A protein has these predicted regions:
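A short, acidic, amphipathic alpha-helical segment used as a generic capping/interface helix at domain edges
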Residues: 36-47
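Short, charged/polar micro-motifs that form catalytic or ligand-binding hotspots
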Residues: 73-81, 137-140
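A gly/proline- and charged-residue-enriched helix-loop-helix capping module
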Residues: 78-125
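Glycine-centered helix-coil hinge/cap
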Residues: 41, 97, 171-175
Length: 214
């Protein structure tokens, strides 16, 4: 993914993307963009032109120690290095402008962790049934990103990644279902602090296409 020596050296300089370090994190991870391998830059180019709708990078070079499974959520803030976050930052800034939402603690990166003792729970912190990656921000009602990046730091060789285009799925729904999606009957949370919700449709037409609002 990176030119080995220079890229790894720059990744070791990445500061925390959390709690007021956004500017330094963006600056240092932007420098990593210069060290992306030509194959990676080619993939990013195809994403920006729309030739690719999605792409899964594998064998990302990380040397940091994976932290132990936490006992609480959110877990204590991790200590350096922040190589995984640097990879996200460099790819994100190659695609455009990286940003975070106020409702996600104003962090640039929203972390999902498994929590010890909740392996079988019906929540996103379980790990034995499914560790759910929340990408709610990709359906934000006010500020919709062009790309959503998901990074799995604990890769399971036996896991299965399922990728589907929601627009293709919606086209297969019965008409009575899609008609309902056009009605303003759906409650959207637009802010958690202070709490604020609005009623909007999930579905709308744009140049005869069917974008999904949420």
């Amino acid at each position: 993914m990176f030119f080995a020596s220079h890229g790894q050296k720059q990744l070791s300089r990445i500061p925390s993307p959390y709690c007021g370090n956004a500017e330094q994190f963006l600056f240092q991870s932007k420098l990593c963009c210069n060290h992306l391998a030509s194959e990676t830059k080619n993939v990013i180019q195809k994403l920006t032109t729309g030739e690719y709708n999605h792409y899964q990078f594998t064998d990302i070079p990380l040397t940091e120690t994976v932290p132990p499974t936490p006992h609480t959520y959110p877990p204590p803030e991790k200590i350096p290095p922040y190589q995984a976050e640097g990879v996200i930052g460099s790819v994100a800034q190659s695609l455009g402008r990286m940003f975070g939402y106020r409702e996600n603690c104003q962090h640039l990166i929203y972390d999902i962790y498994p929590v010890r003792g909740y392996e079988q729970s019906s929540s996103f912190i379980n790990s034995r049934k499914m560790l759910g990656f929340h990408s709610d921000g990709s359906a934000h009602t006010k500020l919709i990103p062009d790309y959503t990046l998901l990074f799995c730091i604990r890769s399971d060789p036996n896991s299965i990644n399922l990728i589907a285009d929601v627009k293709n799925i919606v086209r297969k729904l019965p008409k009575w279902v899609t008609d309902e999606l056009f009605e303003p009957h759906f409650l959207h949370t637009v802010s958690q602090n202070p709490a604020r919700t609005i009623l909007k449709p999930i579905h709308f037409l744009e140049e005869e296409q069917h974008p999904i609002t949420y």
